[in-house]
UniProtKB/Swiss-Prot annotation:
Residues 36-61 have a biased composition (Low complexity). Highly expressed in root tips, shoot apices and developing flowers. Residues 29-61, 303-322 are annotated as: Disordered. This is IRK-interacting protein. Interacts with IRK. Keywords: Coiled coil.
Amino acid sequence: MASSETRMNKAREKEEAIANGVKLRALQASLMQMKSSPSSNYSLRNPSSSSAASPASRPLPNLSAHDYPVFTPSYEDEPVSAFHHKNLTLSETWDEDGVGLVDGDTYLSDSYKTSTSRKTVMMPHQDSHHHVYTMSDALRSPPLHFYTTGRSNCGSVDFRSVSSCNDYNKQKGFDTKSLKSSNLVVPLTDSHSAVVSSQPRNRGGRVMSWLFPKLKKKQKSNSIFNSPSITEKSEEVSEVLKDSGSGVEKLKRELMEANRSRDAALTQVSEMKSSLGELSEKLQYLESYCDNLKKALREATEVVSQENSGGRSSGKKNSEMPVSEEVMVEGFLQIVSEARLSIKQFLKTLVSEIDEEDSTLIGNINTLLQPHNLSFTSKYSKIIQYHLEAIISQSVYQDFENCVFQKNGKPKLLDPEQDRQANFSSFASLRNLSWNEVLKKGTKYYSDEFSRFCDEKMSLIITTLNWTRPWSEQMLQAFFVAAKCVWLLHLLAFSFNPALGILRVEENREFESSFMEDMGADRQRSALSRGPARVKVMVMPGFYVLDRVLRCKVLCRYKSLG
């Protein structure tokens, strides 16, 4: 019940507020009409009997703001209680504001005091009849602007009408022309007076609050921002902004640190670049200095070599070789040692292949040993071994002095320098050749000259020994190793400038220890022979290696003193 009564009271207050607003607008319309005709005399009086008898002057029954919804203002933005802050009558309000008429016109307050039932506003009409506007006529008028004159010596009030509402009057069935020629009475009730009394008292520049709804809306919008939900949202937004601000500060610090690190890195890079530039300059200086030293050393070596070797220039003769002369000498001595060992191993394999029942082969070997008063038996001694070794070495090293290892052979290249380089290149390519590679592809695949050399030496050995049996694989492998070492030794010897020479000695030559090595000296020494030694047989040849001599191995005979 209480809630329903509250709703009814609110609705009633709203309706009263709307009615008060309509009445106030009607009053303003009448005052504005008075302002539009300044030449005529304005009078406020009670309605006469003739005007009361006119049909148009009769008050319209039960007219209210609900009959004119177009002019019903909306007061949602204003509290309803604002219309009741001061309960004054229209006459009191006008008395307080000092609004009156001069020049013989009666005061507006006196006119309102004499009226008992209805209060009317009498206004002059164009046909010199007084036209009375009632509140019903005011409802047909549009909203008006109210203002007063600024003259201090004149108490008259100026009013101006803005527009009309003919469209709405036609819909209601009223004749506008008849209304212009008739006197209409607007009833002014106490509620109307209350509306009029609610006007502000300040003079000059007074503005109604309902004329400026934007101000109210602005106040309302300001109140919206003060609501708790908006406050919470603003707090959240402020927190978010604060967090974002801290994040931005953190990013700024990180950016500053990154910039500092970058500057430091750039500084280090610049320092390193400058250091590298200095090092490159020093390196170029050292390279040029080393080149000058090498050139000076080469020239000095050439001069010394010419003085020591009688015009042979060791620096010039090996200047174009990929390795130095010392390396070549060491390699040559190593190949000589390998060749001697490989020939001994081949001889052992050959002797192991001899069959004692093969009388033809044994007879051929005895024929070779007969000049030395020796014969081949199963229990042969070292002397027989040395003699057989001498026979094999003589066959293998035959024609070693020739440039192509052949009797009366001719060089392939006429330019000695190019020939030396070709010999060394062939030496390097065949140095690591193995027996398994030869079994797969043959010696001719790797070198035609080496293949021809192997065929010639094998044929010479077979012819010398009158060998009639086929060679076994083991014997062939031993022969390949021996032939390879001798061939490499020849290639390397002819890679020098001039080529290294072979040292051979003939039989019955006087023994010279500087060039010969007696392999049977211990046995002869045990025989206490003191006579001059003579070469019996050369077992292994020697070589002339530049300014040195690699002695040959021989067997000597000694004559006893008796």
